[in-house]
Amino acid sequence: MKRISAVMGITAALAAGALVVAGCSSQGGRVASSDDDSSGGTSKGSGLTIALVTHAAPGDTFWDIVRKGAEDAAKKDGVKLLYASDPDGSKQAQLVQQYTDQNVDGIAVSLAKPDALKSSVQAAEKAGIPVVSFNSGSDAYSALGILAHFGQDESVAGEAVGNELEKQGLSKPICVIQEQGNVALEARCGGIKKVLPDTETLYVNGTDNSAVQSTVTAKLQADSDADVVVGLGAPYTAVILKAVKAAGSDIKVASFDLNASLAKSIKSGDVLFTVDQQPFMQGYESIDSIVLYKQGGFVLGGGKPTLTGPAIVDSSNIGKVLQYAEDGLR
């Protein structure tokens, strides 16, 4: 493979659900029943119950990959995995509190809105429940007393995109944020802007794809200076591609994250490249790290985030990656 250029060294995984607890969505794109539990059916189990709590919005299939990693780890370790999600920070905090009240053995939580989650996370820790974070919150987790974090540095990922765009002669991106106030998404656009100062941020309602498309279409029709539009998630980049077509624009498209559809768009040339944070690893390591902590007091990362990305995926390496994307691993 020519490259899956890990812009920062990716820490190797040391090995990677579902009770819905009042979340507006049991997960991203896949719908689960109210008592869906993914313990994996192993005969030799750790006997642990671990909750995975994300900020997934309904229909966002990115989180299916995170959950796949968590489920595989749970199956390997004989863990009963509980899952719930809500994109609203205060409601996500309520989910954490409900799992604390259930006295689970561990909680893995995404920290898109750390201020909203602070009290519930610290309540879990006070109750003696180990908490790890993943995906969002690499700059916030340690201040909350969280044991470990698995994800990518979103500012560095943004800079990687900016550098890649600059290499291709592009200098005026539109960075489309689908969830205002999400610290990870803001950091991505901030990283791009650090490299390319003419970057413009466009906020859209990520819970309504038709609204996303119409907002981006209108922006493209009104803005003739932009030379590339950047989606901050694979499902949203798919909508952006529709908006580009509807606007009759020849603007370039780049992305963050990956799924099978986006992989095919990179292969076809419709999307220049994406930055993959390898969400399967985030889910897998989050569950496995809690098991390791419970069984031996092990803590990964040495006080630093365990990095799962960023890795550039483009035409040079998509042939290798596409197979894994189609299998739901990338």
Task: Report residues per predicted region.
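Secretory targeting and sorting signals
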Residues: M1-G28
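Bacterial lipoprotein signal-peptidase II cleavage site
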Residues: V21-T42
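Extracytoplasmic "Venus flytrap"
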Residues: S43, G47-A73, D77, L82-Q98, ...
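Hinge/cleft segment of the Venus flytrap/periplasmic-binding protein
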Residues: S46, V195-T199, Y284-R330
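Short, solvent-exposed amphipathic alpha-helices that sit
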Residues: T61-D77, A157-V161, V183-T199, T215, ...
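Hydrophobic alpha-helical segments within soluble ligand-binding/sensing domains
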Residues: Q92, H149-P173, A211-Q213, N259-L262, ...
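Hydrophobic alpha-helical
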Residues: A93, V109-E125, I192, G206-K264
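Flexible loop/hinge segments that line or gate small-molecule binding clefts
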Residues: D115-V156, N259-K267, V271-L272, L322-Y324
